């Protein structure tokens, strides 16, 4: 009986160590990734809004393509360098998080390719706005759950709530993305990426 109690205690300690190791491994790196994607997405989105207001030329919407091109390039370089430097085995939780964000990235990429293959269907690109508001929120919420950070969970949920507003517009048959909806997307990037990034880095510095 005593042996069972010790086993349970060791199991709890192991789980706690794994969670703490995951937080230590992911906090700074993941925080920087959140910030890179968040500031890049928000800056490009604001640039598109300004140019559309100034010129009324919809071709400036192509600036949005800078986000995935620059974002995935920087992320790929950082991941490659991190793998070369790190000799610590990844935890199950960190692998799970990486897989979640990999799936989200794959969905974005697959939808973008589909839009390019049906280039003449302009309305299909509106779906990128919906994905850009919903999926980061889901990924951020999942990150918060795995890291047991309620503040990050709340940021993810708020992002999803903002995204559901755009989903309602699509269901009601709205065909054109408005400047206000673009502004909502900027707000979504701030809530789901920038704020969680600063939270993760702040928590990491406190643990050092």
Spans of features found by a protein language model:
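Membrane-proximal helix-loop-helix units in multi-pass membrane proteins
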Residues: 96-156
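Structural signature of hydrophobic alpha-helical transmembrane segments
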Residues: 61-70, 120-134, 183-187
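Helix-coil boundary and interhelical linker segments in multi-pass alpha-helical membrane proteins
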Residues: 49-60, 113-126, 169-179
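Selected alpha-helical membrane-embedding segments in polytopic membrane proteins
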Residues: 26-113
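N-terminal juxtamembrane cytosolic/stromal segments of multi-pass membrane proteins
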Residues: 1-31
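Membrane-embedded alpha-helical transmembrane segments of multi-pass integral membrane proteins
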Residues: 40, 44-47, 70-74, 136-139, ...
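Terminal transmembrane helical module of multi-pass membrane proteins
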Residues: 139-208
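C-terminal ends of transmembrane helices
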Residues: 21, 76-92, 138-147, 194-201
């Amino acid at each position: 009986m005593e042996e069972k109690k010790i086993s349970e205690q060791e199991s709890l300690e192991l789980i706690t160590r794994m969670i703490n190791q995951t937080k230590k491994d992911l906090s700074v790196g993941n925080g920087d990734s959140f910030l890179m994607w968040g500031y890049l997405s928000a800056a490009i989105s604001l640039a598109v809004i300004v140019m559309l207001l100034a010129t009324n030329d919809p071709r400036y919407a192509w600036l949005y393509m800078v986000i995935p091109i620059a974002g995935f390039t920087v992320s790929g370089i950082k991941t490659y360098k991190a793998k070369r430097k790190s000799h610590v085995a990844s935890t199950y939780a960190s692998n799970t998080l990486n897989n979640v964000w990999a799936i989200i990235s794959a969905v974005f990429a697959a939808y973008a390719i589909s839009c390019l293959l049906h280039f003449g269907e302009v309305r299909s690109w509106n779906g990128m706005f919906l994905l850009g508001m919903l999926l980061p929120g889901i990924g951020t919420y999942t990150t918060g759950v795995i890291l047991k950070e309620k503040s990050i969970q709340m940021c993810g949920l708020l992002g999803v709530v903002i995204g559901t507003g755009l989903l309602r517009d699509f269901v009601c048959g709205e065909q054109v993305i408005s400047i206000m909806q673009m502004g909502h997307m900027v707000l979504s990037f701030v809530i789901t990426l920038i704020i969680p990034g600063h939270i993760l880095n702040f928590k990491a510095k406190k643990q050092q």
